[in-house]
Amino acid sequence: MQTRATHPPLSLAWTIWGFGATFYLMGFFQRVAPAVMTAELMQEFNLNATALGNLSAFYFYSYVSMQIPTGILADIWGPRRLLTAGAFLAAVGALLFAMAPTIFWAYLGRFLIGGAVAVAFVGNLKLASEWFPARYFAMVSGAALFFGIVGAVFAGTPLRILVVAFGWRNTMLASAAVTFMICAGVWVIVRDYPGEKGYADFTDAAATRGNNSRQRIFAGIVEVLRYPNTWLLFVIPGGLVGCVLTFGGLWGVPYLSTHHNLPTTQAAALNSALLVAWAIGGPIFGGLSDRIGRRKPIYFFGYTLAVIGWSIILFIPNLPIFLLAALLVITGFASGCIIISFAFAKESVPANLAGTVNGVINMGVISGPTLLQPAVGWMLDRYWTGALLQGVRVYDLAAYRAGFLLMLVWALLSLILLFFTRETRCTQLS
């Protein structure tokens, strides 16, 4: 008979965690889905670039606002209830978006999706901290990013093929149905702690459950903000995530189609290559950081490589297609270094605040695309020359460069801020 003195086998830990990660996959799918249906959405709702940027960013508006509450709820409710509720509301939001008669309802659907899937990543980090030994945390965090990017890849060329074949509304309806099934799976399979399955917990579960007092909630927020690494790691990852998700999640496909003369499906494939490389880079950078016992040097190397890559991709003209593809892969891979932020921040505060600090950091991570997607859209409209193609606005190279400059500035400033972080040497603050 299994005793509580034995920790759960890794196979069970991966299974429990995997159901939560599947929800994160679907959340990432919804996050970047507008990138391959920009023309359909602009035509359906009569949108300019600013309005399209806002439609995509409505996901991020609610996503960002939910990050600190999500971190707190992960500590208080536990990941099972949190992920189940999130998956249910995300399915409702996808249904609303797919059936939207006007742009208002499309905005509302995207807003609901973003707020609902906001729980996915932090919930998965909570599962990782409870079901795996501490030495696995950065690698499992990177694996979560991998799952997310798999969702983004499905939202590339495969989604484009489905949109062409069945229309964007029917395709989004199908995604809502899949999300309802994920909701059911999480509720049936996932458990908060190994102790609920008869195994020994890796953490002091009683201490991490806490209570629902208002004083505890606000004290947790105030406490994590006392540590300088929290502030720095709030800002730093948003620079690269803003580049990846503003380009790969919205403006990359129309840019590559217009200025590299690629068919939409090929542009979507290059976009997917960027995101796949990002997915692969996350667990590799996280695992390498764990292996050498340092956070800062690996993070700095990856960040520097990514900034150089984005500078070339966005501002050097007439790149051969094979070189452009190689640069997108290298830059996406290097951008995976941002996953180190979560282990870095977790080690910088007391262990009982892990959920709260990861919520704060994830809020900073997603603030990049939240601000940059509509900002780049605004710059595109500001520099628009009046060109139209089948009733949809077309933007010239100068307009794209003006918008993309915003992305690069944030990334460069974040690279500078990385110098000021305090190394944890992969050791949890006691």
Predicted features along the sequence, with ranges:
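Conserved MFS/SLC helix-loop-helix module at the cytosolic interface between two early adjacent transmembrane helices
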Residues: 65-104
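C-terminal ends and interior cores of transmembrane alpha-helices
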Residues: 88-101, 304-318
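Extracytoplasmic gate region of multi-pass secondary transporters
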Residues: 34-36, 227-285, 369-377
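Helix-loop-helix hairpin linking two adjacent transmembrane segments in secondary transporters
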Residues: 144-195
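Cytoplasmic helix-loop-helix junction between adjacent transmembrane helices
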Residues: 109-148
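Helix-breaking motifs and short loop linkers at transmembrane-helix boundaries and internal kinks
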Residues: 46, 78, 99-105, 133, ...
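Juxtamembrane intracellular "pre-TM" segments in multi-pass secondary transporters
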Residues: 2-9, 193-234
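Cytoplasmic membrane-interface "Motif A"-like loop-to-helix N-cap segments
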Residues: 76-87, 290-304
